[in-house]
Amino acid sequence: MSQQDKKLTGVFGHPVSDRENSMTAGPRGPLLMQDIYFLEQMSQFDREVIPERRMHAKGSGAFGTFTVTKDITKYTNAKIFSEIGKQTEMFARFSTVAGERGAADAERDIRGFALKFYTEEGNWDLVGNNTPVFFFRDPKLFVSLNRAVKRDPRTNMRDAQNNWDFWTGLPEALHQVTILMSDRGIPKDLRHMHGFGSHTYSMYNDSGERVWVKFHFRTQQGIENLTDEEAAEIIATDRDSSQRDLFEAIEKGDYPKWTMYIQVMTEEQAKNHKDNPFDLTKVWYHDEYPLIEVGEFELNRNPDNYFTDVEQAAFAPTNIIPGLDFSPDKMLQGRLFSYGDAQRYRLGVNHWQIPVNQPKGVGIENICPFSRDGQMRVVDNNQGGGTHHYPNNHGKFDSQPEYKKPPFPTDGYGYEYNQRQDDDNYFEQPGKLFRLQSEDAKERIFTNTANAMEGVTDDVKRRHIRHCYKADPEYGKGVAKALGIDINSIDLETENDETYENFEK
């Protein structure tokens, strides 16, 4: 049947006799409650908005293909990497972090970089960003980050004071803040930025040998960024600039590609590493742990319906496949709970049945038979009348011990250990990053910082200047000048780092 031949029905299939005129008591009388189509349409409309993501609410997505280009089977027995040339269907979602669904794409912000690979061993979600580090390394601070970068509870406006008060209370945040204030703080669009798994993960091979890894995704389109002025001009005319760019590029066959790399660290190297190798505020230097090519992914198909595929896409780092595993990274450990929990709230307990989230390489009849019922259980007949318990005398649903992971290394007693006693090397890496910038790029960091700190109180500005100075004196002096603060009025060599536990006024 053509679109032109289709006739209007209600959601349960009943013919609709009149789409434009409500049922009333007389031509000018009140509406009748028996106008079923009107009631149905309004009640459906009243409920069609689902909760937005607490972070990463504004997003764009596309389907694509991952292809293995290099052999890494000595590190992992994950089937997705089993042979050169192997292809796996995937879905990618990119996002801003702080803004709501209607936020502008060209804001200065971190970009989410979430990938879902539909492998024959289940879905693998790699939930990353366009930066290799994060603002802090303990997940107990995550809720406060959300509060600081979003709207003030009194004014309901984004508040730079809240934002910078939080960031400058965490000296370890300077690395991420430096990236955010640099040229890469505003990618021109989603195609012209790198992506990172950010966390440390692990791989293991057929012999049960484990290595620690970090994932990198380098754009094949090249890096392109926007200045504050360019971004403001774009936002004034197109708040969906990045989404539009990605969609239109794919529609015309200009498919964007990224190359996947890993960095590898042995367990012995991790024991002797200068810093905590699982610290999300730090990178592994490439000269010590070089990038190893793995493959590439291409995005080549736009979703047919944004809500169905992009808004309902659910990513969680707990979705991991044999051959890959987690690490002691505290932030990763915290996300193992929070992401799945948030998706169950936002989309429901059976959100895995939504097509974009369904495991495509595993038959639906093989999905866990012990997870049953719940709202909107629709696609698998709720496992019918089959066995729903274990053990059972039918020999059904036995465990698969061949997929057991190698023992996970841990040490120490359970305790709330002070992270600052373990590692207070906050400023080495942001200092090195600053020194890698060209002179023009450094000046833009100073200017961008001053723009972002407009309206922030002097005590918070001074804390930030002090942290910048500790990373590199030129960094501190440049920020102070841009902020119009005499650097000689600041105690630059105080021994007490200004953390949320120990502010110096």
Swiss-Prot record:
- List the CDD domains hit by this protein, alphabetically: catalase_clade_3
Q: What is its EC number?
A: 1.11.1.6
Q: Name the PROSITE patterns for this protein.
A: CATALASE_1, CATALASE_2, CATALASE_3
What's in the GO CC field? cytoplasm
Q: Name one GO molecular function term.
A: metal ion binding
> Where in this protein does the record put region Disordered?
1-25
- Report keywords, A-Z: Heme, Hydrogen peroxide, Iron, Metal-binding, Oxidoreductase, Peroxidase
What is a biological process (GO) this protein takes part in? Answer: response to hydrogen peroxide
Q: What positions constitute the catalytic site?
A: 56, 129
Q: What reaction is this protein's catalytic activity?
A: 2 H2O2 = O2 + 2 H2O
The entry marks the following residues as binding heme, namely 339
Broad class of enzyme this protein falls into = oxidoreductase
Kindly give the Pfam families that the UniProt entry links to this protein: Catalase, Catalase-rel
Q: Which cofactor does it need?
A: heme
Q: How does it assemble?
A: Homodimer.
**Stated role:** Decomposes hydrogen peroxide into water and oxygen; serves to protect cells from the toxic effects of hydrogen peroxide.
The similarity annotation says: Belongs to the catalase family.
Under what name is this protein listed? Catalase
Q: Whose protein is this, by species? A: Staphylococcus aureus
What gene is it encoded by?
A: katA
